[in-house]
Amino acid sequence: FVHYEGPDRRGIDCALLYDPQQFTVTNSKLVLSTPFEGDTVHLTRGFLIVDGRMAGERVCFIVNHWPSRGAKSPVRVHAAKQVKALTDSLLREDKKLKLFVMGDMNDDPMDESMQTLGARKYVSGMKASQFYNPWWEILEDKGVGTLLYRGKWNLFDRIVLSRPVVKAKKGLRYDHSEVFIRDYLIQQDGKYKGAPLRTHGGRVWLNGYSDHLPTIVYLKK
């Protein structure tokens, strides 16, 4: 795995867990998030950039965990602007870069922060600096999300893909994506039936996995 200690006061950091038989790391760094409106007290997670080789090609990941919904939308837009600057720089350097921006963005796929990043609902009309955001359709059109809050599904956890990933005719390219929903990940009874099965609720151990469901992007070559 790739991990750097970040400035979050609770010790929550971003990391990339990978299979060394599938992916070889060539370079990595943590880019610290700049304070929002000069607030140096509530520092948030940085942006973990991991460059490497997979299936004989260069790929790059930016791992994120944007500020929670306890903060208002402009704080996450601020994070998105910083990631956008990073992706613009990477794609200027290598226009064919297969780049994945991933993590818990604490916003839904159609929210302002994702528009700031340039994450689009559809592949058609994508510009070189934009990303395909398959989760927009999954949430908005299919009603599937990764976390349930007050009876409503949100989809905060996602992987968006640069144009070379979705437009490639050969080599490593996008196939499909899904929210990984299985019975063992879901609360089967009680007040929260149908919600992701948490590890704990308050001080009660629930023996679950997470209050968020995983998302998967499938690639082919």
Residue spans for each PLM region:
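Structured beta-strand-rich core segments of catalytic domains in phosphoester-bond hydrolases
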Residues: 1-58, 66
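Active-site-proximal beta-strand/loop segments in catalytic clefts of secreted hydrolases
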Residues: 2-7, 17-20, 30, 62-67, ...
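Second-shell loop/turn segments in exported
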Residues: 2-4, 36-38, 66-76, 101-102, ...
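Solvent-exposed, acidic/flexible segments
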Residues: 7-10, 40-43, 72-80, 149-153, ...
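Residues that flank catalytic or metal-binding motifs in active/ligand-binding sites
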Residues: 11-13, 44-48, 57, 79, ...
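Short, solvent-exposed loop/turn and secondary-structure capping segments
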Residues: 27-30, 62, 73-74, 111-115, ...
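Metal-dependent phosphoester-hydrolase catalytic domains
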Residues: 42, 89-99, 107-221
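A long, amphipathic alpha-helix that forms part
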Residues: 73-95
